[in-house]
């Protein structure tokens, strides 16, 4: 349902309440029993004969009926205490909001500001601040304990079939363990193979981990534009996206009220929030890339660090010497951030200030533990341009920048394409692992063909499933509106569900120990004609139920042994059940029939005798066979 926490004021209305036949449960890790790690438990019907199924949950408190949601106040700031307990930080006044932060709007056009203000924190010199620094020092943080419990879906020990699942999969060199421990999480972060995006000022966050040895994650993009959307719509899009499974959300707003929109989102977001700071910096100079300066960009970084943004897309790999490599492309430079920096470089005939000031960017981001998402500004925008020299030159530079960021103590992931046909996808994954020291890869799709506007969630979902299998850690969703317009609420859901399918399929292929539990539970429900369980175990129970009820809407149909596809006489699963029931009677010593094995044996004897009677020849006269069959 949609609720407004205060109907007298204009505040966002958001979707709350549990998903169908689900409830919020919490795991308490042995290493930190005070932590409450959220899971969603799918409640099965009484006749299921099996326990309820816990699944990963990204929805935050919005699906917890015991929590009163007040969007105007924001979520509980539980993680702030963790940060303060570790020490090494200070609270300070912070930067004042400036008119240009929201597009120099007049009072009547400005969105309502978020009412609660919290002084920001920043790290002190000489102290460990980032998750990478703690991991390298051998220190397991509460965030690491938390994500380990999430990845195990609350289990305290490995599954019985964990080793078999790992052996059955093909991981392409990934090292997925049978059970995730906090120590394993620490070691992966220390090696740079995983990140926990968690700005020390995003206290509302429920920590999660991104890395190829963990569950494949997905990101949903939201954000306004100069022509459409509002603060209210974007906050609801965020809540809606995480309801259906988005692990992180990027606010890509390019219109007005950028600062205010981001503040509302962050204060109500239980998942990591990412941005592309160059978008807001460009708005501050009235959309003219030539007027961008390092000082303006740095001020924007500080603004967003203090608000609590968890990761920044920074296109520092777009170098002056690479721009000419795009000249003969079919679609040129398609990244907004990449095209902005390319124009600046050409106008000033200088190296990008993102590249020349990269050390300073690292020092700044480290103080707040903001993770890098090193942007692929030269990614291919068509399959004709896939894997060209421009794309790979930038990727090689991103590898160099990764090492610099690691040396500075910053967490890093790498962004990838884009538009890539199926046979060229694995080359991308292998090169990224090699060039970037196995830092997590985060890709937009990739789209595997360019012929389907309106269906690019499908063209990209194919590539996403493949690259996830090959080792990509996080998949950025694509909606049906890709290349066509700003996605609305329904487009967000379609994009998220499509990418949850791709991510889950890649986990199955890698042999993730827990991945197949849900598949098997749904398959059993399907075979047993437990329609409600089948709906509820799916990624989108509402749509599954609606499709079923279009033709069989009555409640009695929820227990029927058929659906409208085949009807009662041609249901393969019902026929299989009948065969099993018949076989069971044959094996019953009290049955009037004989045993199944006996029936088969007698049948073989009859056919053997017939073969001999016909002359024991492999090739027989057709007329003799017909005559023999008439006799039989």
Swiss-Prot record:
List, in alphabetical order, the Gene Ontology terms for molecular function in this entry: 4 iron, 4 sulfur cluster binding; carbon-carbon lyase activity; zinc ion binding
List the InterPro entries.
ThiC, ThiC-associated_dom, ThiC/Bza_core_dom, ThiC/BzaA/B
Example of a GO cellular component annotation carried by this entry = cytosol
What residue range is the signal peptide?
none
Annotated substrate binding sites? 221, 250, 279, 315, 335-337, 376-379, 415, 442
Keywords assigned: 4Fe-4S, Iron, Iron-sulfur, Lyase, Metal-binding, S-adenosyl-L-methionine, Thiamine biosynthesis, Zinc
Its annotated pathway?
A: Cofactor biosynthesis; thiamine diphosphate biosynthesis
Q: Where is this region: Disordered?
A: 1-26
Positions that bind Zn(2+): 419, 483
Question: EC number(s) of the enzyme?
Answer: 4.1.99.17
Query: Which positions are annotated as binding [4Fe-4S] cluster?
Result: 563, 566, 571
Q: How is the cofactor bound?
A: Binds 1 [4Fe-4S] cluster per subunit. The cluster is coordinated with 3 cysteines and an exchangeable S-adenosyl-L-methionine.
Q: Which Pfam families match?
A: ThiC-associated, ThiC_Rad_SAM
Q: How does it assemble?
A: Homodimer.
Q: What is this protein called?
A: Phosphomethylpyrimidine synthase
Organism expressing this protein natively: Bradyrhizobium diazoefficiens (strain JCM 10833 / BCRC 13528 / IAM 13628 / NBRC 14792 / USDA 110)
């Amino acid at each position: 349902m949609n609720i407004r926490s205060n109907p007298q004021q204009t505040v966002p209305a958001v979707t709350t309440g549990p998903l169908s036949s689900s409830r919020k449960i919490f795991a308490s890790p042995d290493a930190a029993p005070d932590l409450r790690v959220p899971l969603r438990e799918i409640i099965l019907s009484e006749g299921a004969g099996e326990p309820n199924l816990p699944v990963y949950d990204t929805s935050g408190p919005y699906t917890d009926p015991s929590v009163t949601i007040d969007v105007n106040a924001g979520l509980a700031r539980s993680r702030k205490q963790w940060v303060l307990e570790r020490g090494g930080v200070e609270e300070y006044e912070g930067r004042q909001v400036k008119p240009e932060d929201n597009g120099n709007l007049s009072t009547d056009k400005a969105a309502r500001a978020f009412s609660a203000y919290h002084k920001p924190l920043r790290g002190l010199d000489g102290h460990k601040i980032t998750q990478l620094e703690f991991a390298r020092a051998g220190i397991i943080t509460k965030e690491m304990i938390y994500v380990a419990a999430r990845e195990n879906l609350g289990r305290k020990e490995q599954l019985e079939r964990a080793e078999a699942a790992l052996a059955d999969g093909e991981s392409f060199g990934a090292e997925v363990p049978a059970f995730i421990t906090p120590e394993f999480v620490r070691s992966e972060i220390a090696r740079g193979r995983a990140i926990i995006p968690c700005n020390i000022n995003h206290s509302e966050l429920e920590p999660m981990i991104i890395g190829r040895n963990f569950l494949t994650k997905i990101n949903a993009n939201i954000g306004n534009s100069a022509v459409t959307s509002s603060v209210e719509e974007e906050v609801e899009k965020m809540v809606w996206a995480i309801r259906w499974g988005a692990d992180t959300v990027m606010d890509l707003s390019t219109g007005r009220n950028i600062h205010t929109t981001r503040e509302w989102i962050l204060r109500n977001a239980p998942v990591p929030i990412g941005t592309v700071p160059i978008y807001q910096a460009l708005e501050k100079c009235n959309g003219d890339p030539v007027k961008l300066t390092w000082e303006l960009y740095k001020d924007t970084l500080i603004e967003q660090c203090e608000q609590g943004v968890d990761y920044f897309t920074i296109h520092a790999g777009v170098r002056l010497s690479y721009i000419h490599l795009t000249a003969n492309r079919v679609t040129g430079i398609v990244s907004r951030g990449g095209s902005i920096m390319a124009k600046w470089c050409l106008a000033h005939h200088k190296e990008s200030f993102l590249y020349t000031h990269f050390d300073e960017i690292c020092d700044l981001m480290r103080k707040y533990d903001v993770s890098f998402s090193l942007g692929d500004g030269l990614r291919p925008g068509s399959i004709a341009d896939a894997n060209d020299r421009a794309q790979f030159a930038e990727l090689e530079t991103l590898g160099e920048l990764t090492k610099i960021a690691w040396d500075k103590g910053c967490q890093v992931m790498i962004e990838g394409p884009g538009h890539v046909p199926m046979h060229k996808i694995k080359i991308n994954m292998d090169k990224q692992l090699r060039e970037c020291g196995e830092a997590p890869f985060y890709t937009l799709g990739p789209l595997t063909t360019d012929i389907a506007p309106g269906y690019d969630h499908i063209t990209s979902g194919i590539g996403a499933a493949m690259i996830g299998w090959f080792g990509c850690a996080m998949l950025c969703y694509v909606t049906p509106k890709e290349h066509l317009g700003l996605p609305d609420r329904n487009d967000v859901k379609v994009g998220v569900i499509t990418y949850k399918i791709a991510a889950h399929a890649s986990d199955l292929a890698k042999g993730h120990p827990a991945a197949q539990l849900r598949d098997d539970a749904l398959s059993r429900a399907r075979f047993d004609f437990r329609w409600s369980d089948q709906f509820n175990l799916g990624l989108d129970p509402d749509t599954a139920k609606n499709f079923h009820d279009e033709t069989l809407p009555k409640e009695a149909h929820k227990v029927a042994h058929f659906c409208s596809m085949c009807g009662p006489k041609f249901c393969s699963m019902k026929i299989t059940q009948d065969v099993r029931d018949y076989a069971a009677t044959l094996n019953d010593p009290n049955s009037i029939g004989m045993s199944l094995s006996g029936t088969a044996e007698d049948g073989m004897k009859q056919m053997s005798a017939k073969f001999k009677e016909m002359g024991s020849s492999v090739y027989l006269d057709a007329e003799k066979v017909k005559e023999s069959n008439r006799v039989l």
